[in-house]
Amino acid sequence: SVVEGYQSTFVDGEDTGWGSESIVAMIKHWPSGGPEEGGRDAHFNYGKYAVYPGNNFKTHLKAFTEGAFALQGGTGRASAVMPYYTISHGIDPSGKEVGNNYSEYIIGDLLRGKYTYDGVVCTDWGVTHNNAAVESFDGKCWGMEQESIVRRHYQILKAGVDQFGGNNDKAPILEAYKLWVADYGEEGARQRFEQSAVRLLLNSFRTGLFENAYTDPAVASEVVGNPEFMKAGYEAQLKSVVMVKNLGNALPQKRAKVWFPKRFYPQTPGPFGLTMGPEAHWDYPVDLQLMEKYYDLASSPAEADFALVFIKEPFHGEGYDVNDRKKGGNGYVPISLQYRPYK
């Protein structure tokens, strides 16, 4: 429904397919972005493997094969796809273990072949860049670490990808073209590059951007920040809140005295060895001035009619600890759901 809402142009409520109000939708991540080993993150070297211990690889494809590739509206299927960083471990019959963006099986045989996808395929960001260390947030060239940057571009093109996400340097692409000429001849190289050019340009033609790439400021001002749209969005958010339990009919509450306990906010590690946000601290999880519009605030549990407690899941890192490695371990640690230290 979301993809159809983006891509289709509607006239008097009728889906007319591609048109001037269409937005190209890029879906991600093929063939899935969830089953990283140990719950780790494939943005890092330590999370580069996707594993399927229950042999559920095909189940993960259903969001694509029965969803975004099988739209009921006039556009038919999502017009662009982004593969994920992971190495889909044990899936390629040839035994090759490379990131999905490099895989001739995942992209060529499955996506392009079995599922006949001929839209734009764009790599995830930075897959051709070098990776400095296991914990580094830089390049994500999984399975191709020993190859040159040019060879990485060449392999991605061989897999059937059209666009390099996060790459602003044309030099390695031009060098990859030369490699294609050496292996398949000038005509073969032109055919391959023109194939991607057609896929990329087609979306501009479909949406009318090739003929008119400009936006009417008057129309834009009517759409952006439109009060009716904002109201509809807010109401949709309210409806998305699901009450799991209401033991003893605790809700709804009339105006009463409520206690809001503070919550602990740890300092969060970020990319490039940096930290995100302020130092670790205790603070209220909501704006108390806003809450005073609806409740009388209690200064302690004893004087409150009830409490509203905001709980956040424990955070113990992304499953890799540099300090563990420095102490002689391998760095790989469980992602614990305990609030206390993992033992």
What is each residue range found by the language model?
Residues 1-343:
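Glycoside hydrolase catalytic-domain context in secreted enzymes
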